[in-house]
Amino acid sequence: MQLPKDFDSYFRERWRDEDVAALVAGLDGEPSVSIRVNPKRLPPEAEPEGADGRVPWCPEGFYLKQRPVFTADPLLHAGAYYVQEASSMFLAHVVRTILHSSFFTLRCQTVLDLCAAPGGKSTLLRSLLPDDCRLVSNEPNRVRAQVLAENMAKWGHPNVVVTQAYAADIAHAIGKAGFAQRPFDLILADVPCSGEGMMRKEAEAVAQWSPSFVAECAALQRSIVSDIWPALRAGGILIYSTCTFNPEEDEENVEWIARELGAEMIPIPVEPSWGIRGDMRKEREIEDIKYKIQDIKYKIQDIRAHQSSIINHPFCHFLPGQVRGEGFFMAVLRKHGSEEGDSEDDAESPKALKRKKKDKRKGNGDAASALTVLPTDVLDETGAPRVELSLEEAIRYLQREALVLPAETPRGIVQVCFRGQRLGLMKNLGTRANNLYPKEWRIRSGYAIPHTLFA
């Protein structure tokens, strides 16, 4: 791979030489292909055709030996699985750690995925969270928000709200009718970034990279987190992630959030065999001293039988060549304040309020008009009769072609299914049937042989 100008020198100023050399070598490797199954759709023993092992930090994740034409598989459109990069599935391990650790005692009633499109992390969150926990999946970009709504509808869980709004507008909407009535218990901020972790997959990530672009992204990330901070309750959890390697967008931003907004970093236990790295900076030996006492505290309060083999990282780096996945970074912070306090004083620090006044993206300040809620119930007709389709019929349905339903099919709205998984709706008129699959979701790509990953 031809790396951007200044890439090597930029990282050598910040990382050890051997770590830079390993990163450059890893970026020359081939990216892996991975999917994550929907536990509400497929049984635990389900394994895709061409599976090449499970993703170690996410039991629902599988590597594939090669990349099939996913569009030609009806089960993808039915929400039976999601094509997701393996490193980003680390969110599953983090959320399970948060929910099941005796230390956090998180009452998970409302969760926000702030920058959620196209939906990989939101679908993962929805699979892990309690059914009575409300998930708000947000995307500020209108086109990407439509894709997010489609994927959440297909994943098939009723307790989801998809919104299109900026972070500041969401913070202002807390308490408004029809939205969250209280600050969020957990916020995932998978913030826009310079995209270093996607360089093996996307030429644009290579072309756009520069030290100045990294600095711009780091500033934007701080602004986004500052804007959403009032929407996180005192004692609530922020999961911060990027698909980058550099310390400006990663370690330094997390430390800035902790220092300026008021939070503590939470070390995450990881298996050494996973290959996940911690703080990558040259001076990390000094920085590690800051976390040593905190790390011991969490070990004592959350003892596990195999704790001696676990590494606790306040920063989690996924580096190509060292993990089987693309570049990714994640850290967890807990907002200062009592978990019982949800008052405005707990929710907003003076520094956060000062930054909010400087923000130019407020518009007219009307949160209700600035926040758009997108429908996710377009497939909801659970009481309708079900009609099973063949593989070829399922693809034709997904292309919005006309189908002839069996003669015994009841008239009216029916659910059409493939392998027992609902694809969508049709209206049977007797002599013909109207295809009600949403036009904007239809398969537009050229011909591909229909297939499915799950027999």
PLM feature spans:
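S-adenosylmethionine
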Residues: 1-455
